[in-house]
């Protein structure tokens, strides 16, 4: 875990919303509303529907999260 109290879960982007918000279906089946982190925004990493992402969630609100990593669609050679 990066920060104390946060936990990370892998998910699949199922819908793209305005203002860099996304609906993500987590591994456990829950659907959350997630925004992209500052490092992803600063490095112009594009996230599209169908991408596998890593989300950070806080125990206070399990319906919202932050996308911290987009997994590669093809493995590196």
Curated annotation (Swiss-Prot):
Localization: Plastid, Chloroplast
CDD domains: S1_IF1
Residues covered by the S1-like domain: 1-72
Cellular compartments per GO CC: chloroplast; cytosol
Domain of life according to the entry: Eukaryota
Entry annotated with the keyword RNA-binding: yes
Keywords of the record: Chloroplast, Initiation factor, Plastid, Protein biosynthesis, RNA-binding, rRNA-binding
Segments crossing the lipid bilayer: none
PROSITE patterns named among the record's database cross-references: S1_IF1_TYPE
Molecular function GO terms recorded: ribosome binding; rRNA binding; translation initiation factor activity
InterPro entries to which the protein is assigned, alphabetical: NA-bd_OB-fold, RNA-binding_domain_S1_IF1, S1_domain, TIF_IF1
Pfam families attached to this UniProt entry: eIF-1a
Similarity field: Belongs to the IF-1 family.
Function description: One of the essential components for the initiation of protein synthesis. Stabilizes the binding of IF-2 and IF-3 on the 30S subunit to which N-formylmethionyl-tRNA(fMet) subsequently binds. Helps modulate mRNA selection, yielding the 30S pre-initiation complex (PIC). Upon addition of the 50S ribosomal subunit IF-1, IF-2 and IF-3 are released leaving the mature 70S translation initiation complex.
PANTHER family reported in the protein's UniProt record: TRANSLATION INITIATION FACTOR IF-1, CHLOROPLASTIC (PTHR33370:SF1)
Subunit structure: Component of the 30S ribosomal translation pre-initiation complex which assembles on the 30S ribosome in the order IF-2 and IF-3, IF-1 and N-formylmethionyl-tRNA(fMet); mRNA recruitment can occur at any time during PIC assembly.
Protein name, as recorded: Translation initiation factor IF-1, chloroplastic
Name of the gene: infA
């Amino acid at each position: 875990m990066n920060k104390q109290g946060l936990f990370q879960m892998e998910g699949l982007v199922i819908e793209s919303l305005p203002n860099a918000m996304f609906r993500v279906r987590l591994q456990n089946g829950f659907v959350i509303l997630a925004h992209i982190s500052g490092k992803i925004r600063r490095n112009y990493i594009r996230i599209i529907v169908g991408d596998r992402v890593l989300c950070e969630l806080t125990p206070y609100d399990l319906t919202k999260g932050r996308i911290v990593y987009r997994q590669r669609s093809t493995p590196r050679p």
